[in-house]
Amino acid sequence: FRETDIVGFINDLMQTFNYQAQKKNITFTFEKELEGADSLKVWIDLNNFDKVLMNVLSNAFKYTHEGGNIEVSLKTGHNDAYRSALKDYFEIDITDNGIGIDKNKIEQIFERFYQIDNDMTQSNFGTGIGLHLSRSLVELHHGIIKAENRKDGQGTHFIIRLPLGSNHLKAEELENPEETGSEPTISQLPKDSIYET
């Protein structure tokens, strides 16, 4: 785990979807609720956390019709109801106005090999392990990920919450950037991500 500016991390990652956004004429935006700050330092595993967002965003683009909207938002929060590591957290929300998910199957999407079954997926099959991988990686970050349908019935809302700070991490999990060089960009990260569900 390394201390990273999550704002820059998300911006770099979103650029990899610019072509898809243009091709489907999808409005793709990033909103920050950081009380005027332009950056937010968090501790993440730079070799794996990109897979979490790439999997969720890939599904958002897959199931959002042409001319639709996909929004990524970032904020921080505090909740005493959470276990100690998550009392102070940062949250990444990914919201689309796509086809949504059957409310009776919404929890199943994180199960290994589960695939959504609808008209849009008949010619667009995936492996069924993308979101399962995302949940596993989020849990390794001591966080939570959940999905819900939007209250207006127009699409899906994914919520990813991870702890702020590094007190929840073991000493051997912390990486010193001075020992490994400068902070890598998304283009330098491993390309073995699994993007589909």
Language-model features and meaning:
Residues 125, 130, 134:
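Short alpha-helical Gxxx[C/S/T] motif in the catalytic ATP-binding
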Residues 60-61:
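Short helix-loop "hinge" at the ATP-lid/N-box region of the Bergerat-fold HATPase_c
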Residues 37-44:
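Conserved micro-motifs of the catalytic ATP-binding
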Residues 101-113:
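Short conserved segment of the HATPase_c
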Residues 142-148:
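Glycine-rich ATP-binding loops of the HATPase_c
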Residues 2-15, 27, 50:
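A conserved beta-strand-to-alpha-helix junction within the catalytic ATP-binding
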Residues 19, 99-100:
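Glycine-rich G1-box
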